[in-house]
Amino acid sequence: MARLLVTGASGFIGSHVAGHLAASGHQVVANGRCLDRLRLLQGTAAQLVVADLCTDALEPLTEACDAVVHCAALSSPWGTAESFSRGNVLATRRILAASQRAGVRRFIHMGSPSIHFRFADQYGIDERFEPPRRWITDYARSKWESELCVRSAAANGLEALVLRPRAVFGERDQAILPRLMAIADRGWFPLVHSGEAVIDVTYVGNLSRLVAQCLEADVVADGRAYNVSNGDPIRVVELVTKLFAAMGREVRLVPIPRGVAVAMAGIAERIARVRPGCPEPRLTRYGVGVLGYSQTLDISLARRELNYAPAVSIEEGIERYAQWWKQHVHA
């Protein structure tokens, strides 16, 4: 079995990836910035190491590692360009350099299909991408720039793959499903475009298993990217209905035109920017766009080259999340 470094192991995706790899028998170094959250992995065989990828020496992390799985990122619909650049580009550049110096064989980078986002319906998006003249979010731009860093390292001899998972959810999720629940706290949920947008989501366990397969995948690891999802596009109204039912919540669904929702989000953003600390508003234009416009991915490349076969359905994934939430959050 291999010695592996998993960055971002104190986060949602990273903790699942580290736990799965450790359970599979690999020697895992689990890195994160928050010791309390890293302790979620204490029941596993993973070695827990606190370090900041932007400031600390990284050689102790990558030393003797066969592969690095880079899950660390600042992932949010709200934030400054500087913070996204630091958390997603600088951190990636530094861990790539440390990996190359340590002789790491393979580098797996967690990218994002948010780079494709437009205020327009898009179906069957493949991995080809041309950056826009103007980015809609600083987050998406930073994720693309981090991919360019990976490609550069691959051109210099490091085996590297990029995974672009769409809307990852599951146990310990702190972003996708909790945000939907928070919006519904008032007893009603705004269904942008009547919830008719068709989207892709990814259960975190399916992603974790794919990462394990990537470690030994017989592919040209030249920094190429792979779309990842559950491969089962679903309408937003169906998704939230399944979520609220699993959580035992009665929520009134209120259809709202896309234009009205975007305007409401714009007002919420302007209010947030003048408040102390510039807190994230409940509605953002990007968030409205994600729920109001269809975006589905073509995952045939991952199926063909990485033998990706998502085993856990959206319905089962939501049920697993609901059970975890009831046991650990709402107990």
Model regions and ranges:
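Catalytic helix-loop patch of NAD(P)-dependent Rossmann-fold dehydrogenases
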Residues: 90, 121-168, 189
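Mid/C-terminal beta-alpha module of Rossmann-like enzyme folds, strongest
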Residues: 214-281, 319-320, 329
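N-terminal Rossmann NAD(P)H-binding glycine-rich loop of SDR-like oxidoreductase domains
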Residues: 4-24
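Conserved C-terminal active-site "lid" loop/helix of NAD(P)H-dependent oxidoreductases
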Residues: 204, 241, 264-309
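Amphipathic terminal alpha-helices
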Residues: 297-305, 309-331
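Substrate-positioning beta->alpha
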Residues: 145-146, 174-179, 193-215, 223-227
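NAD(P)H-binding glycine-rich loop region in Rossmannoid oxidoreductase-like domains
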Residues: 47-90, 98, 118
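Conserved Rossmann-fold NAD(P)-dependent oxidoreductase catalytic core, especially the SDR/UDP-sugar
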Residues: 94-138
